[in-house]
UniProtKB/Swiss-Prot annotation:
Subunit architecture: Component of the ClpX-ClpP complex. Forms a hexameric ring that, in the presence of ATP, binds to fourteen ClpP subunits assembled into a disk-like structure with a central cavity, resembling the structure of eukaryotic proteasomes.
This protein's UniProt keywords: ATP-binding, Chaperone, Metal-binding, Nucleotide-binding, Zinc
NCBIfam families documented for this protein: clpX (TIGR00382), PRK05342.1 (NF003745)
Residues of the ClpX-type ZB domain: 1-54
GO cellular component, one term: HslUV protease complex
Gene3D superfamilies xrefs: 1.10.8.60, ClpX chaperone, C4-type zinc finger domain, P-loop containing nucleotide triphosphate hydrolases
Organism: Nitrosomonas europaea (strain ATCC 19718 / CIP 103999 / KCTC 2705 / NBRC 14298)
Summary of the function given for this chain in its UniProt record: ATP-dependent specificity component of the Clp protease. It directs the protease to specific substrates. Can perform chaperone functions in the absence of ClpP.
Lineage, top ranks: Bacteria, Pseudomonadati, Pseudomonadota, Betaproteobacteria, Nitrosomonadales
Protein known as: ATP-dependent Clp protease ATP-binding subunit ClpX
GO terms of biological process kind: cell division; proteolysis involved in protein catabolic process
Protein residues bound to Zn(2+): C13, C16, C35, C38
Length: 426
């Protein structure tokens, strides 16, 4: 770099022609000089070209069709056919809209708005797994947030903008990637307000959180601290536009069937109390499919929040047969995972008898944990054998079968035959 002194010859930028006195810095190369202003201009041009390249790359990337999305979901999620179809179409339309965003912004008068998704279903029915599988298929950053830990900004608890901070961390602070990610907010039903009427007192973990999430979901510029942590007045922030982030909210909404039934009886749709058996899962699933926005509002979600979740998919409670399928059929089924784990122990084979699978499914049903509870039941069942196996030699197979009362599960260890020694000829 040349110094600004009176003793030396005056130097000029080779690009803009300004003298060293007119700029802050002048950097020298072999018979050439460039000023700080031209460097800034070059950096701006490069940044713009990189953004154009990223947009073009996204446009060229083949977006899986709804059929292809559904096929991938089928590999990991058992049942829930209606929910998978709804999700496949909604996610396809969302990312198709993002791919054609530049066309929309170039003079087209039709603006496509975002359709966020609400998943309603009992614990362990596959809500989180569906969202995770979609993010993995589309290769976009994905983060899960628990609505019960969120509070309004300024109160003790987790700020809603922390969700975007986690999303940014997932993609190594790549802002462009984060702005096309997926956010799954679980337990959304737990932030419903306690009554139909707006409360006079401040509800910082219920309606207040809905109001805060509303801005995030409909599209705002979130200010995220670059290194995480709490915000400070004098620090710089990374700006994240949430307009194109897909938000998927999930919740069990326990008791909403009574609200739907009450509305249906008034309107004469035919869900009479005499006809419905409370314990009949099929009837309950049928009722949930008739959910309307007014039912969600009566449950405790504010109308504006319901309006920002136009795509609603209901998931059925899993029955015994579905839980057995979940154990053995998906691409990463739990039984396949434990088989692989046992095979690492000197090639030991793990086998579950049919009655053992039935017993595991029934345990999960009795605990009301759905598919989520299957792993803990398997861990309990296999704990002793996994503890002893590394210390036992010559094991070829472990068989899990049900006990005499069909609820107990017991492992049977099968040893390999020792090879017979050949007789030496005299």
């Amino acid at each position: 770099m040349s110094e600004k002194t009176n003793d030396e010859k005056l130097l000029y930028c080779s690009f803009c022609g300004k003298s060293q006195r007119e700029v802050r810095k002048l950097i020298a190369g072999p018979s050439v000089f460039i000023c700080d202003e031209c460097i800034d201009l070059c950096n701006d041009i490069i940044r713009e070209e990189i953004q154009v390249d990223e947009t073009a790359k996204l446009a060229k990337t083949s977006l899986p069709t709804p059929h292809e999305i559904r096929e991938t979901l089928d590999q990991y999620v058992i049942g829930q056919e209606s929910a998978k179809k709804i999700l496949s179409v909604a996610v396809y339309n969302h990312y198709k809209r993002l791919k054609n965003l530049s066309k929309v912004n170039n003079g087209d008068d039709v603006e496509l708005s975002k359709s966020n998704i609400l998943l309603i279903g009992p614990t362990g029915s596959g809500k989180t797994l569906l969202a995770q599988t979609l993010a993995r298929l589309l290769d976009v950053p994905f983060v899960i947030a628990d609505a019960t830990t969120l509070t309004e900004a300024g109160y003790v608890g987790e700020d809603v903008e922390n969700i975007i901070q986690k999303l940014l961390q997932k993609c190594n602070h790549d802002v462009e990637k984060a702005q096309r990610g997926i956010v799954y907010i679980d337990e959304i039903d737990k932030i419903s307000r306690k009554s139909d009427n707006p409360s006079i007192t401040r509800d910082v973990s219920g309606e207040g959180v809905q109001q805060a999430l509303l801005k995030l979901i409909e599209g705002t510029t979130a200010l995220v601290p670059p290194q995480g942590g709490r915000k400070h007045p004098n620090q710089e922030f990374i700006q994240i536009d949430t307009t194109n982030i897909l938000f998927i909210c999930g919740g069990a909404f326990d008791g909403i069937d009574k609200i739907i039934r009450g509305r249906s009886e008034k309107s004469g749709i035919g869900f009479g109390a005499d006809v419905i058996n409370q314990n009949d899962r099929k009837e309950l699933n049928k009722i949930l499919k008739d959910i309307e926005p007014e039912d969600l509002i009566k449950y405790g979600l504010i109308p504006e929040f319901v309006g920002r979740l136009p795509v609603v998919a209901t998931l059925s409670e899993l029955n015994e047969a579905a839980l057995i399928q979940i154990l053995v059929e998906p691409k990463n089924a739990l039984i396949k995972q434990y088989n692989k784990l046992f095979s690492m122990e000197g090639g030991v084979e793990l086998e579950f008898r049919e009655q053992a699978l039935v017993a595991i499914a029934r345990k999960a049903l009795s605990r009301k944990t759905g598919a989520r509870g299957l792993r803990s039941i398997l861990e309990e069942t296999l704990l002793d054998i996994m503890y002893d196996l590394p210390s036992i030699e010559n094991v070829s197979k472990v068989v899990i079968e049900s006990g005499s009362n069909h609820d107990e599960l017991q492992p049977i260890v099968i040893y390999a035959e020792k090879p017979k020694l050949a007789r030496s000829s005299k």
